[in-house]
């Protein structure tokens, strides 16, 4: 079985995340693509919203997307302590494709147990138009081109905090979850 991992804090999920999942799934002909919500990522600041809320929004967005084989995955938020990609990969029985953008690919050398990860996954290198190329010696890479979308979770949080609309930036089903919890000030 060919399994993709699209991981992130998804704080909150936005349309760019959904585009990545859909394009990686289709371009690589994957049997399953797991949108994995990070629990306590060791290289990032703690998320604003708790894992359960972020997962609920991801689950709503993915269900609304309605593409067979793309699923929301809460395995990392259920795991205590720092979450590492290698631990998630080791739980998968099949050929694993790890979706990663150029920015994160440049920092792979700092990842936990990176040598093991290199042996276990094919990188689904998500390339945005105009993004600089990245050299990944020793990695097996399958490039996936996606359309340029100028959206980020931090931008969405800032707009919500300022009371500005995020229509078109956050999947409507996910936005309903965000409204329910009211985690981001000024949510509308």
What are these regions (language model features)?
Residues 1-188:
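Nucleotidyltransferase catalytic core that binds NTPs
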